[in-house]
């Protein structure tokens, strides 16, 4: 059976990581995968995470199932960090996910199950896995202009012009902050305009939030997201805890639905 499978192409980021590890130069700098490193090149466990693990080790008395949606207490606390009381708790649904990628996948499966999804609009450029997951799920996609390489900023006029072509029941995928790969973010005023366009077009906003706290701070980084979810009827948010909690290998994330 398996002899008929074709070998998958190697991951370019993983190839780059291997090359970096083999490089003997002392002045090398790793600009590959998005992992925090200190001055010594190590990725330490945060003190708060280590303390939490110690408490869990001491007090946890069961490994029994917690239900299909995972730890609701954990998910609600992450929701509080992300949403800052911008929407009524009654409008929120949560599910623990295996990282931000798992949350993204779960929410796209949920949207696909409605059988009413049109195109999913992703920025050009965007995180490569966005396109890969959409293709794997058989969901149609369109792209919108985002980054101006001359000014190194968002070209909002071109972005807005492209998004004017969205149709009812399309999904607009936005980066919550620290846009990957450009680092260029929408201003709060631009979030307001995009929110109005979402309302006018009756499309579903989908926020990929992987870097909260790495831009202008935990609260500032989600101001635009908070405004948006407060002013739309429905939204989806995929949250990654890999970066801001430094728990990359533990695959920690949350899928949030606002309805």
Task: Label each residue range with its predicted role.
Residues 37-41, 181-182, 246-247:
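Short catalytic/ligand-binding loop motif for oxyanion handling, primarily in non-cytosolic enzymes
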Residues 1-68, 80, 84:
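N-terminal "arm"/small-domain region of PLP-dependent enzymes with the aminotransferase-like
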């Amino acid at each position: 059976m398996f002899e008929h499978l074709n070998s998958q192409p190697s991951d370019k980021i993983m190839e780059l990581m291997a090359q970096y590890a083999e490089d003997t130069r002392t002045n090398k700098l790793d600009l590959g995968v998005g992992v925090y490193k200190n001055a010594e090149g190590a990725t330490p466990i945060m003190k708060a995470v280590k303390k939490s693990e110690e408490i869990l080790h001491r007090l946890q008395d069961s490994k029994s199932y917690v239900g299909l949606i995972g730890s609701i207490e954990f998910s609600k606390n992450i929701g509080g960090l992300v949403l800052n009381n911008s929407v009524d708790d009654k409008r929120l649904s949560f599910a623990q996910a295996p990282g931000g990628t798992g949350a993204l996948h779960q929410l796209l499966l949920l949207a696909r199950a409605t059988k009413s999804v049109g195109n999913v609009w992703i920025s050009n450029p965007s995180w490569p896995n966005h396109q890969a997951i959409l293709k794997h799920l058989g969901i149609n996609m369109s792209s919108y202009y985002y980054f101006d390489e001359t000014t190194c900023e968002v070209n909002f006029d071109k972005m807005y012009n492209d998004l004017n072509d969205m149709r009812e029941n399309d999904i607009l995928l936005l980066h919550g902050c620290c846009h990957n790969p450009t680092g260029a973010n929408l201003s709060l005023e631009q979030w307001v305009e995009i929110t109005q366009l979402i309302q006018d077009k009756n499309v579903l906003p989908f926020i990929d939030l992987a870097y909260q706290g790495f831009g202008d701070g935990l609260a500032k980084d989600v101001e635009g997201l908070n405004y948006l979810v407060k002013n739309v009827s429905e939204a989806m948010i995929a949250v990654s805890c890999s970066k801001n909690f430094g728990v990359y290998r533990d695959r920690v994330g949350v899928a949030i639905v606002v309805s």
